[in-house]
A protein has these predicted regions:
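Charged interaction segments
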Residues: 28-141
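Short, extreme N-terminal segment that most often corresponds to the first beta-strand
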Residues: 1-34
Length: 141
């Protein structure tokens, strides 16, 4: 059986930040980080077009969680996954956040979920460390 090494892969997830009293500045900073990403036309694996940018003026006063979602489809991104993760981690280093989740769905090796967690209560740009763990689920079919 010949394998298709250029099978479609889908990457999606979200970055969450719980805003506090200085939340508006954090939201502006996060927005600048997302807008500073390269365009999809640059062939960057992580690019600004894959993100849904939350509007700064539209927020529910009942909640304080900023959710920045993203998604894209690729041909065989799992073969360049090291580089995708490096680019995503570089973005996270520039942002305020409390957690991030990335799902990688591949036709060949199932679903991988990457969970990014701060080492404290909040990741501060260029100052805080974070950890990542991977969970793998493969369809038995």
């Amino acid at each position: 059986m010949k394998k298709d090494f250029q099978a479609e892969s889908v990457v999606y997830g979200c970055i969450k930040h719980i805003t506090a009293s200085d939340g508006l500045e954090h939201k502006h900073s996060n927005r600048r980080a997302l807008l500073g990403l390269p365009s999809v036309e640059s062939w960057s694996l992580v690019n600004r077009e894959m993100f849904g940018l939350p509007e700064l003026g539209c927020s529910n006063t009942e909640t304080s969680t900023q959710v920045m979602h993203f998604g894209a489809s690729y041909r065989g991104v799992e073969y360049e996954w090291k580089y995708w993760l490096e680019q995503f981690e570089n973005l996270l280093r520039k942002m305020y956040w409390v957690s991030a989740t990335v799902h990688l769905e591949t036709e060949l090796s199932g679903l991988h979920s990457f969970l990014f967690e701060t080492c404290g209560n909040l990741h501060v740009p260029h100052q805080s460390e974070f950890n990542v763990r991977c969970e793998w689920a493969r369809d038995p079919g």
